[in-house]
């Protein structure tokens, strides 16, 4: 999954990683500080905050070591100790603990810590679609443990993204339309897209980075029995028959299937999941059902994770971070009017 990124940035990412405890199963960096987005110049990219995620097997031990090495990164929660920090990480929001606006090696960074098990559950089942959603889009993998379960879960997450996108697209579409749909999956229902994000965020992510998306999805598309991938023309065709859509629905992550079931099945009926998904496969409004089910996952996790961020970052940093996001939103609105 490692992808080429902006020229000359790989060494700095590895240097930054060296400032942290090294017992990490997966570390990656992502976002506009790594992959150039539409409307950004080279200087803009150099000045952007860098975003990282670290997956660790034992968060208590990792936070213990990180507080020793990087005590200033933490809010007042450091005084409660690593067990309380881990409890906040695991029991609230999307299971991720973020330290933000951290000066490191001449750059400002934000990094999230997630347990390896929480990451696996999100990749496989889309419990929150928080980290799984980030991994639908190009990222720069900095370290990845040789672990068959993790490798399989990362691939499963990409296949799930394709199936969900297929169900919301027409029978024939361009590669760019596919990647726009995939990139938007984890923003469906995210309240930050209403308040605090660039209104053209999904378009800006995809437009300059189609080759990076191709590196993630081309091999899976070629191997997909329900799709015809015409790489030379940049087109994709999918099976939109009820049988084809049923297979795609059955391959969706468990949490998304549960949300679909809750939307479609009247209370008290208690039908089998297979029966409900067969009904959805024949529904002309199948795509809107998928969209609503995604909203339910993302809305809940984005709200609770953002609320947790006020505690983990502290009030001062939360205000600074929110101000930056609001500035981006207002700038995109001004661009839209011009």
From Swiss-Prot:
Cytoplasm keyword on record: no
Keyword Magnesium part of the UniProt annotation: yes
Pfam families xref list: Tam41_Mmp37
Enzyme Commission designation: 2.7.7.41
The organism's place on the tree of life at top rank: Eukaryota
Keywords: Lipid biosynthesis, Lipid metabolism, Magnesium, Membrane, Mitochondrion, Mitochondrion inner membrane, Nucleotidyltransferase, Phospholipid biosynthesis, Phospholipid metabolism, Transferase
Class of the enzyme per the UniProt entry, highest EC level: transferase
Record's GO cellular component terms: mitochondrial inner membrane; mitochondrion
Membrane-topology descriptor: Peripheral membrane protein
GO biological process, one term: CDP-diacylglycerol biosynthetic process
A molecular function (GO) term: phosphatidate cytidylyltransferase activity
Pathway it works in: Phospholipid metabolism; CDP-diacylglycerol biosynthesis; CDP-diacylglycerol from sn-glycerol 3-phosphate: step 3/3
Needed co-factor(s): Mg(2+)
Protein location: Mitochondrion inner membrane
Catalytic activity as recorded in UniProt: a 1,2-diacyl-sn-glycero-3-phosphate + CTP + H(+) = a CDP-1,2-diacyl-sn-glycerol + diphosphate
InterPro entries: Tam41
Its job: Catalyzes the conversion of phosphatidic acid (PA) to CDP-diacylglycerol (CDP-DAG), an essential intermediate in the synthesis of phosphatidylglycerol, cardiolipin and phosphatidylinositol.
Family affiliation: Belongs to the TAM41 family.
Protein name: Phosphatidate cytidylyltransferase, mitochondrial
Origin species: Xenopus laevis (African clawed frog)
């Amino acid at each position: 999954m490692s992808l080429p990124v902006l020229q000359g940035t790989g060494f700095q990412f590895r240097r930054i990683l060296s400032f942290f405890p090294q017992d990490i199963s997966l570390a990656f960096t992502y976002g506009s500080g790594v992959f150039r987005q539409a409307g950004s110049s080279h200087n803009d990219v150099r000045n952007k905050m860098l975003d990282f995620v670290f997956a660790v097997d034992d968060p208590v031990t990792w936070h213990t070591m990180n507080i020793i090495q990087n005590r200033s990164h933490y809010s007042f929660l450091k005084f409660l100790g690593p067990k309380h920090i881990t409890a906040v990480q695991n029991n609230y929001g999307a299971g991720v603990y973020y330290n933000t606006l951290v000066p490191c090696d001449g750059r400002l960074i934000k990094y999230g810590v997630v347990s390896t098990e929480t990451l696996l559950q999100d990749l496989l089942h889309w419990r929150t679609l928080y980290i799984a959603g980030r991994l639908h889009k190009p990222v720069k993998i900095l370290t990845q443990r040789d672990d068959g379960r993790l490798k399989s879960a990362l691939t499963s997450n990409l296949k799930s993204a394709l199936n969900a996108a297929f169900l919301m697209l027409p029978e024939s579409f361009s590669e760019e339309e596919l990647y726009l749909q995939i990139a938007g999956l984890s923003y469906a229902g995210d309240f930050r897209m209403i308040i605090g994000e660039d209104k053209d965020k999904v378009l800006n992510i995809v437009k300059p980075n189609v080759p990076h998306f191709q590196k993630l999805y081309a091999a899976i598309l070629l191997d997909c029995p329900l799709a015809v991938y015409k790489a030379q023309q940049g087109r994709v065709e999918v099976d939109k028959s009820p049988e084809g859509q049923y297979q795609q629905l059955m391959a969706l992550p468990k949490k998304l299937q549960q949300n679909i079931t809750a939307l479609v099945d009247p209370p008290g009926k208690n039908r089998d999941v297979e029966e409900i998904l067969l009904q959805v496969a024949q529904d002309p409004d199948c795509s809107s059902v998928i969209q609503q089910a995604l909203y339910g996952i993302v809305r809940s996790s984005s709200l609770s994770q953002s609320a947790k961020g006020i505690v983990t970052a502290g009030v001062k940093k939360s205000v600074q971070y929110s101000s930056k996001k609001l500035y981006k939103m207002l700038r995109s609105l001004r661009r839209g009017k011009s």
